[in-house]
Amino acid sequence: MTTDPISLLKRVLSSVEVKLILAWLIVVIATIFLDPGSTYLKNPGSTAELVIRNTVFLGFFALGSAVIIISGGIDLSSGAVIAMSATVFSSLLMLIDPEGFRAGEIQTWVVVVSVIGTLLSGVMVGTLNAWLITGVGLPPFIATLATMVGLRSFARGLIQAVTGNRSQIDFPDLGLRDSLKDVTSVAIVFLIFAGILWFVMSRTVVGRHLHAMGGNEQAAKLSGIRTDRLKWLAYVIGAVSASMVGIVYFADQGSAKPDILARGYELNAIAASVIGGCALTGGVGTIPGTVLGCLFLRTVIDAVNKIVGTGADVYEGMIVGIVVVLAVTFSQRGSGRISKPFFGSLIGWACIPVLGLMAGLSFVLFFREKEWFTATHAVLFGMLVLACLTGRAWIESRRGVKSGLFVTRREPPRKS
């Protein structure tokens, strides 16, 4: 049996992973040309280390979120689990060896016991989430939203109980900070973790059952799959992976601040999973795609930091939101799940000036401190976006959308 080379090439190029690699290359090349400091050219090593390090930290708990999404769930509590785990880890260190903690010399066995205790707390959180969903019958969104709020409150109360009404726990160094600076070692550990999850999700019965449950839970139940146990496994994997990140963050930063630590990280994890090809409806997604989604997201954020400069971190949430919207749009249009025109209704036409105005305002926010910036640039950019969207709406109104993002067809004339 021979394989048509053209068909094989189309199949390879249509994969999410290849598309992400191409998109990542485009972002890197664009950053090289737009970065006024030419950081990628002057300091390629340090820049690559920073991006890889941030990708690894995001990747650990994003992979856990991906498993949950593939199984048909959602987890809004991963950021709170990170904060709680850092708090539990630091509290165990302080309670087990108070003298060593004050002196800044924690014994190895104390660290090991604290790590095990923290990971067990992650198992408990995953079990709680699974019970709220399977036992109580709450939707995953509501169940994990409740634990997200509750865990941060619990972490604040735990710190006050352990420290005597302080709001954070500080520790100079656990001896791991230098190891965490070795990006190669950290990346290898992450790839091993990702490889294990890839094997489980793609080469085992459990992984196939998780995909099947995410695709159609009722059909999975009728086929004899124990969906409740699978949900427990998925949420435990998600919570334990977040607990690992909480331990690493405390070891790296030397401080547990549940009020601010990892706030909003759950959205980044979901964003990376969606960018990597995971469908929020469940049943679709890969571990390699999620890894590349993390790399792409962190590269985009790093590119914005370099191009915009001072204060770019303020716009990180906006960038993540835009990237997620584009990723989901391309995914749904490319798969043919949605063929409705973007601007085929009155609401769509009304949104065109809104998007043009937002584009102009975003231009002002990003580039207002640049020497070349004038208000005329922002107005022209907003008008350009407005013209492009209006043209797109006009094409849709004349032809109608068949499928895909820009694939159109002419509607046949109606018979009177």
Question: Where are the language model's segments positioned?
Answer:
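Amphipathic cytosolic juxtamembrane alpha-helices at the membrane-cytosol interface
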Residues: E217-K221, I225-I237, P288
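Alpha-helical transmembrane segments of multi-pass integral membrane proteins
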Residues: T31, R177-M213, R226, S241-V245, ...
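Single transmembrane alpha-helix segments in multi-pass membrane proteins
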Residues: T31-L34, P44-F101, W131-L138, I270-P288, ...
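Cytosolic-side transmembrane-helix boundaries in multi-pass membrane proteins
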Residues: M1-I29, G195, L222-R229, V300-S416
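Helix-loop-helix hairpins and the membrane-proximal interhelical loops
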Residues: D4-V56, R208, I247, A251-D259, ...
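Alpha-helical transmembrane segments within multi-pass membrane transporters and channels
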Residues: E99-M148, G195, L292-L297
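Transmembrane helix-bundle core of multi-pass membrane transporters
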Residues: V112, P140-R203, W232, D252-A262, ...
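Transmembrane alpha-helical segments in multi-pass inner-membrane proteins
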Residues: A242, Q253, K257-V324
